[in-house]
């Protein structure tokens, strides 16, 4: 076969297989048998192997899985992947409707309701119609690059029907039938099964070997358009229609509703229909449909004001409590946990449930051997609601909390105004281990590859006892641990080294100072700028900071008034751990008189000197708001190269337009 004929046949096969994929995985209407599909795929794979110069990144053959990865790279989202506020009953939905109408002066509101798929949120980036990158949601700001695994999902188009640059967001999931089949295979192989389809989807997508993901038969529904160049779409429902036209799989069960009564009826309808779907849903997402109204309502730090997620009611089941286990947290709190006969609840096999504290056990008269009601909703930890007293036989055992710590044998105490028993031994191994797990966690030092399992191994091997010990770990030590090879050990040492460059707020949160959460840690870091300045702060100086109360101030002062802590900080310095704040000082910028304060700005086209993401951050730091489309409420359009249709929209609405040079002049004043 000549090169010219081979190239033509390769292109024919790609078009044919892309059509077959779309019909089967998006339209759910296959036109050929599996055998015919496989025959065409094998022919394509063979021709591409014989003619590697014709290989393409968007070939359907890529979906069988590519090269094994060493690590998932971090990806910063162009715009945050915000979580949604929750509604749990009809009253919550009506409150949401009232807030929306108040926020837009009772303008006519149309809602769009969609099924809330219980999977893994991901973003998909396309340039000129080609899929170039996919990422997990992560913490909403930073996710992980899972491009190669997403390419194995046949519901995700590798090439769109238009040469458009955009970001789509959606939910990757595992169909129920695929989940059942996968667990059957795992059981036959003597492997641990997945608890639910969501965990199976997440575990499959985060495999370093894309071939594993390719075998798992994952799918995806796209639910939103986050960034699209040169196109203004006035409503969310129209954006979903547009995504469908481009070749994405969108959920067909969405509905627009003119009133909150229609929304409630939709929720009730799908609560009944839910079991008949071949994928898990855990609620309904309700959004204001009009994009201009969405922009008018805006967002809070965590979630948009124009959307809410209705969560289906918690599921309750009865099972037998077979024992009570104690755990010691990083602050010394001793928590009892019920051990249960395994039972399926809310799509998950549950073997343990929270008992909270000793008072709850006494109040509910919970005994070992009791039949109890267990409740679970979504990701919430299962809890024991009450005892079925009618099922008691007289053989049940009363439970009494111990007087000494199960980890270190120190006497337990109950501090004033607390219900929990607490171990106050600073050398308690359980507290130290839990503290280390917290220190490396995502919102703290965020050390990739250092999870609970590895921390436990390092702790048991006596390689680490303090936070600073992490920075003395060597590759040779890691190679002594189970499941560590040359690459994984090298990657972890590098990840630990990279964490030295974190901004101060991450280190502060990681230290686990009592009462200091992630938000307070950022407040302290921004206010004092250096660890040394914070260490010297008095209780009065701390309380003078907005939102810092007496308990937190006292806790911070007490923490740093400790020789062991000061020694730890000195060790951090010696290892080169950054202890200064690297973020934007929003408080300072808000005091600067700025043109952007209170203004609504649209960025369009390519900015040469700084990216649009950086420009957005600077405008927001100076009190402005950046939106994605031009409307009559827009104050300014900043137009870079190839600005396109937004210039026409600016002219239509009589909005001022700046080029990049003028924009930079204003920023640098």
From Swiss-Prot:
Enzyme category, top tier: ligase
Q: Which domain of life is it from?
A: Bacteria
Show the catalytic activity. NAD(+) + (deoxyribonucleotide)n-3'-hydroxyl + 5'-phospho-(deoxyribonucleotide)m = (deoxyribonucleotide)n+m + AMP + beta-nicotinamide D-nucleotide
**Active site per the UniProt annotation:** 116 (n6-amp-lysine intermediate)
**CDD domains recorded for this chain?**
BRCT_DNA_ligase_like (cd17748), LIGANc (cd00114)
Q: Which GO terms describe its molecular function?
A: DNA binding; DNA ligase (NAD+) activity; metal ion binding
Name the NCBIfam families for this protein: dnlj, PRK07956.1
Q: What is this protein called?
A: DNA ligase
* Organism for this UniProt entry: Bacillus cereus (strain AH820)
